[in-house]
């Protein structure tokens, strides 16, 4: 089995991945040549057993398969050995395996497990606590080890209840079990889901290419889904509008940049990140237009600009309501039709998305949850039954986490209403996406040339 996981994997979004202003690149995920701490032994000071995982340097939960390790690395090693998986590194076997990036490359992580002394022969169903047991053992309160947040967030936590070989969430403490029945605070798992989604957002927004990219005008979509830089370079996402008014070509370039952002997000959010590239592309085609619309709308509100009727773009340009998008030539009628259609899209975007986001005062936590709910849609043609099942579980975990967060923040009655209004934003984004698709249809009818990537991905007639 070949490791098809993206370099911008889910684990790269864990806590302590860097300061908010840091720029992340592929190089930051690779092994440094010198100076990195790596546990060289299993004993701490004065012969005491180390509390640091020998594989990823996270907080260890005990001795597993011959070495001191965390639950995450223990479970990863056990699943790999039991399934007989054979991973292949795509980055010259130089991937850095630490707390923040341990899931960047499964091949290098498994090799690190072997290097520090994990023993495949130690995995026995009759002795492995998470496998079949001849004599099942019960936990006592005194035997429960501490587990750090970084060790638990390898996946969306509620996904683990779907996997029979899950370890992290099954062994981690949950505040839900310790809370009184009437306690409205979100559970530890719910908080973990929202924290992870926020970290994913921060990572993907900060991604920039620090090398020259091979951008193509006609990139093959099957390849671009795993190499988004074929579509556009990862330039700084800056929605401040300081560069002035955008024209039609500028809008096209910005749409390409937001498509790259969406691809990076898809390649980061599990379980989507673990799917086959063909299934990732199917998901991308189904969500990319409303996803970009919701992303752009939220950023236009978040900057708190005085022009409430303008749409702000990631290049630093803006689209005021009164500004013409096209430069007219001799074919006056064609451009009048196109301008009217473009104005319809702009008006729908402003009224259905931007004004609603501003009215609801949507928070970043709510927005990252909404985007994940949109992306984790299993009702997409072309997905396997197994993939659909994974998406269902993941989506429900995000929905539950969001609702628990709303109850804790607003109380039950208001939370129910707000939850419904937030979900309606997804429907509104889809309506705006159809008006954008209508613009592309008119462009085709009047022989106005459309960017290949935009027509391929944003024209809903192709879905």
Curated annotation (Swiss-Prot):
Protein task: Orphan nuclear receptor.
GO biological process, one term: tissue development
Protein name as it appears in the record: Nuclear hormone receptor family member nhr-3
Gene3D superfamilies according to UniProt: Erythroid Transcription Factor GATA-1, subunit A, Retinoid X Receptor
SUPFAM superfamilies, alphabetized: Glucocorticoid receptor-like (DNA-binding domain) (SSF57716), Nuclear receptor ligand-binding domain (SSF48508)
Organism taxonomic ancestry: Eukaryota, Metazoa, Ecdysozoa, Nematoda, Chromadorea
Subcellular location: Nucleus
Main location per the UniProt record: nucleus
Cellular component annotations (GO), alphabetically ordered: RNA polymerase II transcription regulator complex
Keywords noted in UniProt: DNA-binding, Metal-binding, Nucleus, Receptor, Transcription, Transcription regulation, Zinc, Zinc-finger
GO MF terms held by the record: DNA-binding transcription factor activity; RNA polymerase II cis-regulatory region sequence-specific DNA binding; zinc ion binding
Organism name: Caenorhabditis elegans
Keyword Transferase carried by entry: no
Family: Belongs to the nuclear hormone receptor family.
Keyword tRNA processing: no
SMART domains reported for this sequence: HOLI, ZnF_C4
Residues covered by region (Disordered): 121-143
Zinc finger (NR C4-type): 53-73, 89-113
Feature: compositional bias, Basic and acidic residues: 121-131
